[in-house]
Amino acid sequence: MPAVKKPQILVVRNQVIFPYNGFELDVGRERSKKLIKALKNLKTKRLVLVTQKNSDQLNPEFDDIYHCGTLCDIDEIIEVPSEDGKTADYKIKGKGLQRVAITSFSDADLTKYDHHFLNSTLTENKALDKLLERIFPDKEDFAEILDSLNSFLELQELKKLSKVPKDIKRYDIITFKLASLIFKDITLQQAILEENDIEKRLQKIIGSGIEDLGHISEEARAKQRESEFDKIDNRITRKVNEQLSRQQRDFYLREKLRVIREEIGMTSKKEDEVSNIRKKLEENPYPEHIKKRILSELDHFENSSSSSQESTLTKTYIDTLMNLPWWQESKDNADVKNLIKILNKNHSGLDKVKERVVEYLAVQLRTKKLKGPIMCLVGPPGVGKSSLAKSIAEALNKCFVKVSLGGVHDESEIRGHRKTYLGSMPGRILKGMVRAKVINPLFLLDEIDKMTSSNQGYPSGALLEVLDPELNNKFSDNYVEEDYDLSKVMFVATANYIEDIPEALLDRMEVIELTSYTEQEKLQITKSHLVKRCLDDAEIKTDDLKFTDEGISYIIKFYTREAGVRQLERLIQQIVRKYIVNLQKTGEQQVVVDVDLVKKYLKKEIFDYTVRDEDALPGIVNGMAYTPTGGDLLPIEVTHVAGKGDLILTGNLKQTMRESASVALGYVKANAQSFNINPNLFKKVDINIHVPGGGIPKDGPSAGAALVTAIISSLTGKKVDPKIAMTGEITLRGKVMTIGGVKEKTISAYRGGVRTIFMPEKNERYLDEVPKDIVKDLEIILVKEYKDIYNKIFN
């Protein structure tokens, strides 16, 4: 069998460990910490604890320690941060087992020592019982002796010893317990530990002064204690009365308790907290009015009961004032070149947006003033509004704080609750400032268009004070009740729909619109950012899993339908997960993600995009739709049958598009002869206008020109080339009005096979947003009136 190692020796200071006694020790010396660190890995954790004679000795040798210690079981080892913060200290908990005599000791190796165990000796139980009677008169059995110990020393844990048998161990337990509780002097404690004879040990305890208790009756002893307590109480009362005149009873009791603590040299947790707060106020440049307010609240806190609700509320309020940044300021990076570099690194595409952001910030960086309007980024979900704000904060070296305003309907969420209310707290603005810890962060107000109003106030009204540069230097929060300067905060707001932003707020903001990403932009974002991030998260090398451009484009076209790239990223993650599973099964490490693998991993396509018809038919014309996720072709079908001149609209058309259809028909009727249509025909036929995709609601006026063309084509039987598409609102006088979403509509039409596009002349200024490689392959015809379209198509 392998030899069992001796327990190592741990030298302790200012404490003697007795058998049968539990203990806690803080371990901070380097040699001791190495010992405890090694002990953590052992199954049986035992140490021999010996006390050093001089507590100031850092590295005690054999002559510097007492040669009698205690073998102990170590039950718990707790790692705690050290004062230097570099290495960990330890706290150990355990229980003494048996006394040990050390006869030699090696400072180099704590396991090299000679020892033998010490056993207590018992001469006669009766003599010991008599000695115990001197301490505990009139007690018939051991349980009553322990009850007396409890009564005298107020230690309930001794009750569990009442079942210990009447033998040597019984007297060991009593004497060592008494010695640990009564003696504070290390020398006296060590003398008790080294004494083998239980009778002599007990006599030493009696000789310390506790024997006086054995010569007086229970009644006399009670009177003596009462007399001593009276003297102390009278002295305390006298002191309290000097300080009090006419105060309430609870204040009297608290003051009395404070004096008692002074008498016994004990400070409370509250006193420590108050002392720390006063120290911080002295050391830091808090504004004078804030110092005055904190000191006033501190007086209330000191004079309130620690268990009272008032004390908790006051302390929370003080902490809020202390934690708000009043003077702390980070140093901004005013380098515009660095701003451009960071924006280009973190965001593909968005060239117009980045240009506007740089222009907006360049002036503020030059003047070092934030007096201009607040930047508001508006766009569909997932196009990078929040990440753009983060990049701005990174480039300017500003702390980034985000507060989501979606669903906020209570003004108190912005301005805070009055601190007299139960559960009151500051508003989201000042909570964000507490998190920022500086007075000049970049503060993102996310989803500002999602706030609602209720009978609890108007949150948008509270935000006016926050966002107005002329007012926010004295922002008032109901909870703090002190003016707070927000003038150095750079606020950036985000929204999905500009029409949902309250007009008063919109007036204070510089709106920068982020449109949906094109397929080419999504491809670049995926290659530059998404794939790398997904592979890094899964700890996969880029050489092991390669994504082809064709594979990524296939995912974009047939598995996503979104303005941003969130769903696209989720699909990339799904492919990565399937790759890892396949790697575990087959061991195939290097894989190329092409179209075939995308189909295998993601199964059948989820979406499709509209493609033009191959054959031309009367009454069918390609419109162009602008959707929240981009754009698409909008085929319009018109047919006429014998009837009474009714207009039938199908395809889930909303109000605006229904009106546009009525206007289109009215224009055709008014100009029927110009279009070679018999005016009497309208009384004899019903015209049915249908837009395929009945499950999708369709709205907007931009299909007017296409509706007119489809009606003329149906009534005249003339076909329209399917390679043609058009967009533009029509008026009753035939003018083609400007529309929105030029970039998205043009890209989707090109994707669908269209090569000629009619659009309003006033939309020419938006064509520079369309990728040049698409524009060069298209014939874009700009028109003012519908007759320009008619002449090109039908003549």
Swiss-Prot record:
GO biological process: cellular response to heat; protein quality control for misfolded or incompletely synthesized proteins
GO molecular function, one term: sequence-specific DNA binding
Alphabetical list of SMART domains matching this protein: AAA (SM00382), LON (SM00464)
Upregulation: By heat shock.
EC number: 3.4.21.53
CDD domains reported in the protein's UniProt record: RecA-like_Lon
InterPro entries given in the database record: AAA+_ATPase (IPR003593), ATPase_AAA_core (IPR003959), Lon_bac (IPR027543), Lon_bac/euk-typ (IPR004815), Lon_lid (IPR054594), Lon_proteolytic (IPR008269), Lon_Prtase (IPR027065), Lon_prtase_N (IPR003111)
Substrates-to-products reaction catalysed: Hydrolysis of proteins in presence of ATP
Domain Lon N-terminal: 7-213
Residues annotated for ATP binding in this entry: 379-386
EC category: hydrolase
Keyword Phosphoprotein: no
Oligomeric and partner information: Homohexamer. Organized in a ring with a central cavity.
Family of the protein in this entry: Belongs to the peptidase S16 family.
Protein name per UniProt: Lon protease
Native source species: Mycoplasma pneumoniae (strain ATCC 29342 / M129 / Subtype 1)
Organism ancestry: Bacteria, Bacillati, Mycoplasmatota, Mycoplasmoidales, Mycoplasmoidaceae
